[in-house]
Amino acid sequence: MYVIAGLGNPGREYEGTRHNVGFMVIDELAKKLGMNVTKLKFKSLVGEGNFKGEKIILLKPQTFMNSSGEALYDAVNFYKIPLENVIVIYDDKDLDLGKIRIRKKGSSGGHNGMNSIIYLLNSEEFPRVRIGIGKPQKDLVSHVLGKFEESEKKLIDEAVIKAADAVIDIIENGIEHAMSKFNG
């Protein structure tokens, strides 16, 4: 069983923003896996299904970014899932736009959603897929809550597809394989 959480902020006003790239990847995964992420559970929009004999739970926390840990904590405790089977997908301002990075574990890198998750799970020992949103030209809040420029959309759309493929590869072939295939 895998719990896969894409981080973002709920509400129409945040759709398409840099901070919501995790939600975009969950939507892409749902499409690829034939799932609907519409049920409200664990303070999240949830989709449940199966892939290659594994139960898959897709989460889009509805707690707002800085409290993402509440949703993930509830799901992890409900399913009694080992942390190596929890995959978190989120934006990273320190990665170039459109780049993805997969890691087995690590710090929050200053990302408040990840701070919340690490604090509530009491561990940094879970896989994550980071999607580069580029360095801010202006202040950080305006950057992460801003929408992608028209010139950036093709690159970010490709990154979302690549990140979804990377998550599928983690499930099928393990994180080491996915890291060597997708970390460029």
From Swiss-Prot:
Site (Discriminates between blocked and unblocked aminoacyl-tRNA): 9
Residues holding tRNA: 14, 64, 66, 112
GO molecular function, one term: tRNA binding
Major location (coarse): cytoplasm
Catalytic residues of the enzyme: 19
PROSITE patterns: PEPT_TRNA_HYDROL_1 (PS01195)
E.C. designation(s): 3.1.1.29
Example GO biological process: rescue of stalled ribosome
Keyword Cytoplasm: yes
Keyword tRNA-binding carried by entry: yes
Function (record text): Hydrolyzes ribosome-free peptidyl-tRNAs (with 1 or more amino acids incorporated), which drop off the ribosome during protein synthesis, or as a result of ribosome stalling. Catalyzes the release of premature peptidyl moieties from peptidyl-tRNA molecules trapped in stalled 50S ribosomal subunits, and thus maintains levels of free tRNAs and 50S ribosomes.
HAMAP family: Pept_tRNA_hydro_bact
Family membership: Belongs to the PTH family.
Protein name in UniProt: Peptidyl-tRNA hydrolase
